Amino acid sequence: MANRRSLFSLSLIFVFMINSAIASPLTYNVASLGAKADGKTDSTKAFLSAWAKACASMNPGVIYVPAGTFFLRDVVFSGPCKNNAITFRIAGTLVAPSDYRVIGNAANWIFFHHVNGVTISGGILDGQGTALWACKACHGESCPSGATTLGFSDSNNIVVSGLASLNSQMFHIVINDFQNVQMQGVRVSRSGNSPNTDGIHVQMSSGVTILNSKIATGDDCVSIGPGTSNLWIEGVACGPGHGISIGSLGKEQEEAGVQNVTVKTVTFSGTQNGLRIKSWGRPSTGFARNILFQHATMVNVENPIVIDQHYCPDNKGCPGQVSGVQISDVTYEDIHGTSATEVAVKFDCSPKHPCREIKLEDVKLTYKNQAAESSCSHADGTTEGVVQPTSCL
């Protein structure tokens, strides 16, 4: 009997050891695979080698980037992988080519495609976009469009934590065709005038959470594109920039809508807009509904609350300036602070599909220490509590 117990105990220990070995993550140090922390040597192959090893393993993996500066060209990390737990732990800085022409026509600088269970923890991504911005300021369309710094597509269950993105050529972070993403403690910043550099852009995705982040950029701090649902944004400080924008929507005739969006406990400082919904002035099947803007502070914001359904850059392709996008069930609750312009609340909606079920609750916005104004066109809704400026709904 004693021998049987001993054999049984040994069997349990053996099984435990096997399970522990399977569960233990394997670490792949990019420096051990040839990456150089000098900011000059091309380390792209070393990063791809680390990814290939982690992706091919049945065990969870950690791709470790030590302190220092690592030069990367445009790179794609593709799945599917054999495990759903790969972490990029970045202690250093990844830097793009200083010559914007090297990656300027690539859609993305760093791109994850068809992956599941990837975490990016810490680190700095420097897109080196300053020279491209200068080119665009002088030469316009003759310059490359620029690369998004960090792109994700056709993926699930992604976490980005404590990451900083600097000086992107185009958008800083793009989330496209996703399920379940959490972004926390993200910092976005730029030096100088940086056109079309949205901080975080979300589209065709569901279950995205953006928490406790600071975004200073040359365009929207967060932009929300077609096909976005169940989006939660909380604890974001925005500025400078163009605010948090749903849209632009309705560029395409057949287009998925936006629904179930919450934006709360956010601060806008010196931004062009605060809480904005915008759609093209053209026919579309798009919509925006079930939107909650709650607990927002405005500090000298040009357009604190705005719906613009007559968006049409260069006045091209917008017959009659009539938007087909239907906007409904939008609540603004506890919005307060200062406007940099006299009109602090502006609802400029579609004459064909007026905005419906707009609700203002406990809104107090002032202009130069005096009452601001509101402006409504083709908008219907209600108010509750103290609402300043006086509602035009």
Swiss-Prot record:
Organism this protein belongs to: Prunus persica
Family: Belongs to the glycosyl hydrolase 28 family.
Function: Acts in concert with the pectinesterase, in the ripening process. Is involved in cell wall metabolism, specifically in polyuronide degradation.
Subcellular localization, as worded in the UniProt entry: Secreted; Secreted, Cell wall
Listed name of the protein: Polygalacturonase
Sample GO molecular function, one term: polygalacturonase activity
PROSITE patterns named in the record: POLYGALACTURONASE
Active site: 219 (proton donor), 242
Record's keyword annotation contains Signal: yes
Alphabetized PANTHER family for the sequence: PTHR31375
Enzyme class: hydrolase
Biological classification of the source: Eukaryota, Viridiplantae, Streptophyta, Embryophyta, Tracheophyta
Signal peptide: 1-23
Glycosylation sites: 260
Residue stretches of each PbH1 repeat: 115-136, 178-204, 205-226, 228-248, 258-279, 288-309
Main location: secreted
Highest taxon of the lineage: Eukaryota
A GO BP annotation: cell wall organization
Enzyme Commission code(s) on record: 3.2.1.15
Catalytic reaction annotation: (1,4-alpha-D-galacturonosyl)n+m + H2O = (1,4-alpha-D-galacturonosyl)n + (1,4-alpha-D-galacturonosyl)m
Listed GO CC annotations: extracellular region
Gene3D superfamilies: Single-stranded right-handed beta-helix, Pectin lyase-like (2.160.20.10)
Cystine residue pairs: 221-238, 349-355, 376-392
